[in-house]
Amino acid sequence: MDSKEVLKEYFGYDSFRAGQEDIINAILEKKDVLAIMPTGAGKSLCYQVPAMMLSGITVVISPLISLMQDQVKSLNDVGINAAYVNSTLSESEIDGTLNMVLNGIYKIIYIAPERLESAKFCEFSKQADISMVTVDEAHCISQWGQDFRPSYVKIVDYINSLPARPVVSAFTATATNEVKTDIECILRLDNPKVVITGFDRKNLYYSVEHISGKNRDRYISNYVKEHIDESGIIYCATRKNVDTLYETLSSMGISVTRYHAGLSNEERKRTVSYTHLTLPTIRLV
């Protein structure tokens, strides 16, 4: 199948969005790629489609467990065999997953950047036929960005340790010129195809309110009550802030759940499942 046939067969689309086909063609020509595209523009398809066409497997480096789980579920739902390896799995489950990859069961495997340093994964990588390494949320590699993750800087060491250098593709929705340069340099992208489709999302409205700390919780509580028939996501700076706001809204009788790394695997799974159900109705962030 060619890329358009893969797109139709697995994802049900007849045509590509802006930038997607250029990225996919570059990957299939074994060229490194850096893509800067807004959220919702279809970045994932840009590596998932060629992953189905390349001879080996694709390793996707993703910073969040919830993102991995969501992507893998979506792929499995459309008939693409994908898996993840992260801290929610037992050692025996990890061993089983990696063996299934080696046996050709899975074409795409999602991992956290920290996993690249584990002896088990490094040994697996030496045995696996890795055609592409995809770096999702690639802005995490840059100290210019507020989401800097030190483990992202070591991705290039992992790539260099592989028996044969794979295609390297990097994707982000947010990158200043400094961050873009960092991604190219730190990952040592080889004369990459750079695709920038813009940042503007015409379906979103942005508003900024300057609220002092002591009035913040009251403002949020009132705002939620005013939009009681709508669903939304509230991002907080710390786990403690998440827990405090969760308790406040719960005490008001508002249907609310929470998600952060300090929760049990079971509670995080429940939250992800709940979010999947409510995602189509989310109107506020």
Annotate each predicted stretch with a short phrase.
Residues M1-I36:
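Conserved pre-motif I regulatory segment
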Residues N25, P50, S74:
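Hydrophobic/aromatic ligand-binding patch that stacks against planar heteroaromatic rings
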Residues L28-E29, L34, Q69, K73-L277:
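Helicase motor core with emphasis on the C-terminal RecA-like subdomain
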Residues T39:
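The conserved Walker
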Residues S44-I57:
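Walker A/P-loop NTP-binding motif
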Residues I57-L75:
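Conserved Walker A/P-loop ATP-binding site and its immediately adjacent core
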Residues H276-V285:
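Single conserved hydrophobic/aromatic residue that forms the stacking wall/gate
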